[in-house]
Amino acid sequence: MKEILEKIKKNAIEELNNVVDKETIESIRVKYLGKKGELTKILRGMGGLSAEERPIVGKLANEIRKNIEEIIETTLKEIKEKEKNIKLSEETIDITLPGKRQYLGKRHPLEQTLDKMKEIFINMGFTVEEGPEIELDYYNFEALNIPKNHPARGEQDTFYINDNVVLRTQTSPIQIRTMESQKLPIKMIAPGKVYRSDSVDATHSPIFYQMEGLVVDKGVTFADLKGTLDMFAKKMFGEDLKTKFRPHHFPFTEPSAEMDATCFVCHGEGCKVCKGEGWIEILGGGMVHPQVLKNCGIDPEVYSGFAFGFGVDRMVMQKYGIDDIRLLYESDMRFLNQF
């Protein structure tokens, strides 16, 4: 019996020394140590041995079993290590190869311009206020001194959700809400999207960006408005920029004016951007109408204020010489990558 056990050990070790994969190891384990394996059969047949042989054969069989298990474990580790090394060698990165440049996105020119505008006004002491884009008719029109039969209320200019609710046509409602809810003095800007019932063409869009501003305090004058807007224009387009004001009419300001600036492309010489005039209209404003102050519970005999507003899209188009507003909304990377 001892010779049979030694032969089993020898054969198992020889087979394990020639193993090249995990599947073969498993088949050898089953062959010798499985339920029907050669060594298992001997252990199960020990009942037929004499009392003197049984402990000797049992001890030797268990030693051989342990020895085969250790060799199987060691061989299995070696094969796994070889497989890992082969896989790593096949996946080796050649560090001498040129890298692949990842595409870096750019911020939209509208966003860049809005952020610059906000930064300028914040540095001048303004706060940034926000409001709903779906607005009550009262805040969008009536509180701003735009009566029921005013042309601006026509369906050709406004998206009506129902008789009392509209998509805001301007960010002016934020001024009303701010005057109603905050303590005086007020110094704020209101940037955001607005909506008009316009057909899409090179200069019109049903959605665009607007920024409005409001200052209310005791002793505010038109000179304060001029100084604020002149400083903004110079910070936005260059210190050598010149501005001028022309009388105009807005229902919510009195007196009202539009501000022109020397063309920031030709610097007043005349070009296609300014249509040869050397000046570009960039915004409108004026002193807050006394009725608007009254609508917000502010005494116009004690307080005064100025308000202004401008289209951000239009200013972007003027600054960069863009002749079609649709380019700002079509997400064409060939266009946007220029900024």
From Swiss-Prot:
Protein name (record): Phenylalanine--tRNA ligase alpha subunit
GO molecular function: ATP binding; catalytic activity, acting on a protein; magnesium ion binding; phenylalanine-tRNA ligase activity; transferase activity; tRNA binding
Organism, as annotated: Clostridium tetani (strain Massachusetts / E88)
UniProt cross-references to PROSITE patterns, sorted A to Z: AA_TRNA_LIGASE_II
InterPro entries: aa-tRNA-synth_II, aa-tRNA-synth_II/BPL/LPL, Phe-tRNA-synth_IIc_asu, Phe-tRNA_ligase_II_N, Phe_tRNA_ligase_alpha1_bac, Phenylalanyl-tRNA_Synthase, tRNA-bd_arm
NCBIfam families (alphabetical): pheS (TIGR00468)
HAMAP family, per the entry: Phe_tRNA_synth_alpha1 (MF_00281)
Keyword Acetylation applies: no
Cofactor remark from the record: Binds 2 magnesium ions per tetramer.
Binding residues annotated for Mg(2+), in chain numbering: E254
Alphabetically ordered keywords of this record: Aminoacyl-tRNA synthetase, ATP-binding, Cytoplasm, Ligase, Magnesium, Metal-binding, Nucleotide-binding, Protein biosynthesis
Subcellular location: Cytoplasm
Reactions that this protein is recorded to catalyse: tRNA(Phe) + L-phenylalanine + ATP = L-phenylalanyl-tRNA(Phe) + AMP + diphosphate + H(+)
Cofactor field: Mg(2+)
